[in-house]
Amino acid sequence: MAHVIDGKAIAQSVREELRMEVERLKLNHQLTPGLAVVLVGADPASQVYVRNKKRACETAGIASFSHELAATTSQAELLALIEQLNQDDAVHGILVQLPLPKHIDEQKVLEAISPSKDADGFHPYNVGRLVTGDPTFQPCTPWGVMEMLKVSGVDPKGKHAVVIGRSNIVGKPVALMLLAAHATVTICHSRTPDLAETVKRADIVVAAVGRANMVPGSWIKKGAVVIDVGINRGEDGKLCGDVDYASCFEHASAITPVPGGVGPMTIAMLLKNTVEGAKRAHNIA
């Protein structure tokens, strides 16, 4: 029987710590951290994410600047807005909600964000610093995964961690973070031969592939820790992760649920990046 790693509770604790830290920054330094969120178009899922981020900012005492643009907004107009936010001293974190409309080059947009305001941790400069192990904005979801392991008392040192998925948003950065925590890391993907055998040797499994219930319990070594980053709709229309929760629960020593696992951590770490950005901008330790 697995211990359930409660992402909601851990995220709530992170957000409460941040709320107190923001209060101190306001009191001692007259500084209010600010996050600008840019949404292009009216994608319903993106609108929900943006609303959640705004609400989370308000609860933590962080200033929230929302920029909702029409789907017809040109790339040049979007880049001009980002440059304006780069120059705005009240903004310490900038997040452009993905996906963007097809006529806009996502990579160009992400690279236009100042590395010192890159709240999502996606800028190539910050990714490079992650590779070299230097202090940087960390990608929110992988950082949330690492925080969950830490709070749950799981030390990756000396353990075999298998990451399923090689995206720039989760797979690659979480592998780098696990490596920095002294785990032996294997990255698996759609071309990996005999995926099941590789996963069976893992002490820690991070599933981030976007395929509903892809990992069955028979792949999980007795006592392994399972972190499910996937968020999918199952055949029954219900939200589910990349791992088959019920069967993996029987084998794992600890597991994250979907929903209520990694998801809440992503927003908590986004707020943490914003507060860190404000402190760095004002040389506050």
Swiss-Prot record:
<feature type="binding site">
    <location>
        <begin position="165"/>
        <end position="167"/>
    </location>
    <ligand>
        <name>NADP(+)</name>
    </ligand>
</feature>
<feature type="binding site">
    <location>
        <position position="190"/>
    </location>
    <ligand>
        <name>NADP(+)</name>
    </ligand>
</feature>
<keyword id="KW-0511">Multifunctional enzyme</keyword>
<dbReference type="GO" id="GO:0035999">
    <property type="term" value="P:tetrahydrofolate interconversion"/>
</dbReference>
<comment type="pathway">
    <text>One-carbon metabolism; tetrahydrofolate interconversion.</text>
</comment>
<dbReference type="Pfam" id="PF02882">
    <property type="entry name" value="THF_DHG_CYH_C"/>
</dbReference>
<keyword id="KW-0028">Amino-acid biosynthesis</keyword>
<keyword id="KW-0658">Purine biosynthesis</keyword>
<dbReference type="InterPro" id="IPR020631">
    <property type="entry name" value="THF_DH/CycHdrlase_NAD-bd_dom"/>
</dbReference>
<keyword id="KW-0554">One-carbon metabolism</keyword>
<dbReference type="GO" id="GO:0009086">
    <property type="term" value="P:methionine biosynthetic process"/>
</dbReference>
<dbReference type="InterPro" id="IPR036291">
    <property type="entry name" value="NAD(P)-bd_dom_sf"/>
</dbReference>
<keyword id="KW-0368">Histidine biosynthesis</keyword>
<dbReference type="InterPro" id="IPR020867">
    <property type="entry name" value="THF_DH/CycHdrlase_CS"/>
</dbReference>
<dbReference type="GO" id="GO:0004488">
    <property type="term" value="F:methylenetetrahydrofolate dehydrogenase (NADP+) activity"/>
</dbReference>
<keyword id="KW-0521">NADP</keyword>
<comment type="similarity">
    <text>Belongs to the tetrahydrofolate dehydrogenase/cyclohydrolase family.</text>
</comment>
<dbReference type="GO" id="GO:0000105">
    <property type="term" value="P:L-histidine biosynthetic process"/>
</dbReference>
<comment type="subunit">
    <text>Homodimer.</text>
</comment>
<feature type="binding site">
    <location>
        <position position="231"/>
    </location>
    <ligand>
        <name>NADP(+)</name>
    </ligand>
</feature>
<dbReference type="GO" id="GO:0004477">
    <property type="term" value="F:methenyltetrahydrofolate cyclohydrolase activity"/>
</dbReference>
<keyword id="KW-0560">Oxidoreductase</keyword>
<dbReference type="InterPro" id="IPR046346">
    <property type="entry name" value="Aminoacid_DH-like_N_sf"/>
</dbReference>
<dbReference type="InterPro" id="IPR000672">
    <property type="entry name" value="THF_DH/CycHdrlase"/>
</dbReference>
<keyword id="KW-0486">Methionine biosynthesis</keyword>
<dbReference type="GO" id="GO:0006164">
    <property type="term" value="P:purine nucleotide biosynthetic process"/>
</dbReference>
<dbReference type="Pfam" id="PF00763">
    <property type="entry name" value="THF_DHG_CYH"/>
</dbReference>
<protein>
    <recommendedName>
        <fullName>Bifunctional protein FolD</fullName>
        <ecNumber>1.5.1.5</ecNumber>
        <ecNumber>3.5.4.9</ecNumber>
    </recommendedName>
</protein>
<dbReference type="InterPro" id="IPR020630">
    <property type="entry name" value="THF_DH/CycHdrlase_cat_dom"/>
</dbReference>
<comment type="function">
    <text>Catalyzes the oxidation of 5,10-methylenetetrahydrofolate to 5,10-methenyltetrahydrofolate and then the hydrolysis of 5,10-methenyltetrahydrofolate to 10-formyltetrahydrofolate.</text>
</comment>
<keyword id="KW-0378">Hydrolase</keyword>
<dbReference type="GO" id="GO:0005829">
    <property type="term" value="C:cytosol"/>
</dbReference>
